[in-house]
């Protein structure tokens, strides 16, 4: 009799939970329509993989790319709609969140054709790779729209778990296994630190988890200037710092960049920073509204350390991927300037604009590295000597992307940095902007050093890797060149195109 009653209660409780979930999905599902498209694409990938053979492999790429393009289209159709909060306050939809989601989808869309030839040459499992990329993209999109502490923790974990699996995808490579181990251990530690910071914020606000309600709770409890908030700020900054990888939270970055498959590095190098930047702007700007001076100081220290250490250490690197790892540490220092400036002086707009250009510059560089690595099997900077004599298109593409990363006019990187530094100067961040300008000059040095090697014509400097360089006979070579061309064109956008981009970015402010 007791068992019968307990069984009935279990059925009733399960029914209520199911009905509540169905109600939320029915009435709030339209707010996550782009995410639902990706979920449908994931299900379709699994179904095709379980019922198909090797001949259907092109369909896997087609479904993945189509899902991403359709998700981008859904986002664009929803542009300029009124901000909405859905799923009982867990998710917020507005232009600011959506432009970061657009950037993440753009990264993933460009990374899939970039990966095709690499997957074929290394004979990696295709379906699992695409599943991890789409799932990580989904986690990044949910993080951009997260409106409560639980979602802000769960969404990046979804992204991080896929990142760990992708970084160790080449299981037979010792460097890949080492990179995954370091990435996993440090990622787990940073997640613990982040949750600890959330617990202080939760307790200080009187048990609130929604971002805006936390602010109201801090006002009601008079805890907005308490030591607990300072402790929460420090722990949350450290936790988010792992995702952004500024110095001194950068230790994992060079090893993961060097040991992971190159298409994976290309994907992680941009998507993780875009998602973490979206989360950081909302966390610092809303719950820590009353502690703006404190978090400004913390971020200024991180930006200075990142710009100086990242660019100085990059000079000494001999591996192309390790050089880009330290370069990315310096680049995130520039992005942090936009976060500090905020929306009062166009800081967020300049940050979004620069990240858009950074995506094209960085992915274009990695597309060139993937192409060169597959034909030579090397990642050493010295082995790029004389590439112009064998493959002028690849050498010129790499040179343009590197020059744009360095910020030389009239390339896109120059105008992105110019607008970012100008906003910082207007906000009174004179010392920070001065450091940014000096370190940009340093970065130009090591980029030009690589370009000089690319264009050298002296036989004694050309290594056997370039002397024996052969173009790939694979048809998929067209896909990597497609990504490369798109990124190179975007990296060379002249300043005349800056105004409409900045105007669109300005519309994304809160």
Curated annotation (Swiss-Prot):
Catalytic activity: a plastoquinone + NADH + (n+1) H(+)(in) = a plastoquinol + NAD(+) + n H(+)(out); a plastoquinone + NADPH + (n+1) H(+)(in) = a plastoquinol + NADP(+) + n H(+)(out)
Record's GO cellular component terms: chloroplast thylakoid membrane
Keyword vocabulary terms for this entry: Chloroplast, Membrane, NAD, NADP, Plastid, Plastoquinone, Quinone, Thylakoid, Translocase, Transmembrane, Transmembrane helix, Transport
Enzyme Commission number(s) of this protein: 7.1.1.-
Chief site of localization: plastid
A Pfam family it matches: Ndh2_N
Superkingdom of the organism of origin: Eukaryota
HAMAP family associated with the record: NDH1_NuoN_1 (MF_00445)
Function in brief: NDH shuttles electrons from NAD(P)H:plastoquinone, via FMN and iron-sulfur (Fe-S) centers, to quinones in the photosynthetic chain and possibly in a chloroplast respiratory chain. The immediate electron acceptor for the enzyme in this species is believed to be plastoquinone. Couples the redox reaction to proton translocation, and thus conserves the redox energy in a proton gradient.
Subunit structure: NDH is composed of at least 16 different subunits, 5 of which are encoded in the nucleus.
Family: Belongs to the complex I subunit 2 family.
Protein name: NAD(P)H-quinone oxidoreductase subunit 2 A, chloroplastic
Provenance organism: Morus indica (Mulberry)
